[in-house]
Amino acid sequence: MKISECMTQDVRLVSPDDTIERAAQMMGSADTGVLPVSDGERLVGMITDRDIAIRGVAEGCGPSARVGDIMSREVKYCFDDAEADEVLVNMAEIQVRRMPVVDHDKRLVGIISLADLDREEPARSGHALREITQPSGTHNQSR
């Protein structure tokens, strides 16, 4: 199955010049934890609720801070004609739950999530989720 057959096509976008307050409000109304950041038709980053909390609020940025100042610039993406099982393996390897989908002109056409893939390939998405939720570093909240 191709990613274009199971991706979410109605994707909300923010601009690098939008405020993190606006991004957080959009996440809340869309019930999502991630928004692609675009400059016109070009995908230039991603911003997550974690980015807002860790790179924004925890670093003293106020609600008027710009998305472009705290977004992740290194965007991992897949093509709309990629096979779903290959994308799922890639998502597990790079430990992401959501990935922007672009066409071969690198224009954003959708977003794929583990939930989207779970509807199509539940057994494989469970394995990917286990890989994604493995800690990538030392974490200790037992103190």
State what each model feature region is.
Residues 1-11, 65-75, 132:
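Bateman (tandem CBS) regulatory domains
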Residues 4, 12, 21, 53-54, ...:
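Nucleotide phosphate-binding site architecture
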Residues 6, 27-30, 35-51, 91, ...:
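A glycine-centered beta-loop-beta connector
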Residues 13-31, 38, 78-95, 102-103, ...:
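The conserved cystathionine-beta-synthase
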Residues 41-42, 46-86:
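A contiguous binding-surface segment within folded domains or other stable secondary-structure elements
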